[in-house]
């Protein structure tokens, strides 16, 4: 069946005009960054130009500063003592599907306080189960990706819960669009 799908995110890592974040030596450009150029919505073709401009500006800034950056090469080897091979990969797959369903059903195009609360409740359960897997199994890319997706989902829901108006693509049935508040 044809269903809505998230193919980009509005928001992300807040950066300055050179793509610098608030974390020293961390730059962001493209879909992961929040430049402020889009306002309350994202125009379809603008993201490509934004990515090109900000990646160019970030690269130019890094080139100027690269000689002064200190790199820590003393990183300890991974210690997997006390962990086991994951015998239950189906748990990772199941949690990923559940996460996708929660975000699609409750944090999609139309939102409400009730849906967001339900999403947060489910996210806490998925988080707890996933952290249990992380603590006792050898780390895998799939498990790390799931943990990252849960973190992003949590941040999206938390931010949506803090918003008390409907602006651009941030629409809630509980709050009128800003245009109606102004008129």
Regions picked out by a protein language model, each given a short descriptive name:
Residues 8-10, 14-28, 32-183:
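Glycine- and aromatic-enriched mobile tails/lids
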Residues 2-5:
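Short Gly/Pro-enriched turn/cap motifs at secondary-structure boundaries
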């Amino acid at each position: 069946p044809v269903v809505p799908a998230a193919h980009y995110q509005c928001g992300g890592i807040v950066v300055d005009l050179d793509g610098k974040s608030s974390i020293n030596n961390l730059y962001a450009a493209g879909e992961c960054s929040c430049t402020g150029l889009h306002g309350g919505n994202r125009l379809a073709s603008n993201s490509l130009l934004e990515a090109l401009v900000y990646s160019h500006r970030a690269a130019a800034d890094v080139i100027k500063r690269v000689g002064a950056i200190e790199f820590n090469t003393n990183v300890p080897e991974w210690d997997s003592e006390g962990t086991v091979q994951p015998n239950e990969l189906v748990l990772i797959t199941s949690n990923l599907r559940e996460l996708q369903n929660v975000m699609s059903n409750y944090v999609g195009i139309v939102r409400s306080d009730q849906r967001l609360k339900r999403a947060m409740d489910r996210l806490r359960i998925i988080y707890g189960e996933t952290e249990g897997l992380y603590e006792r199994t050898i780390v895998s890319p799939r498990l790390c990706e799931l943990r990252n997706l849960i973190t992003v989902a949590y941040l999206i829901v938390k931010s949506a819960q803090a918003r008390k108006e409907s602006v651009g693509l941030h629409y809630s049935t509980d709050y009128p669009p800003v245009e109606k508040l102004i008129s």
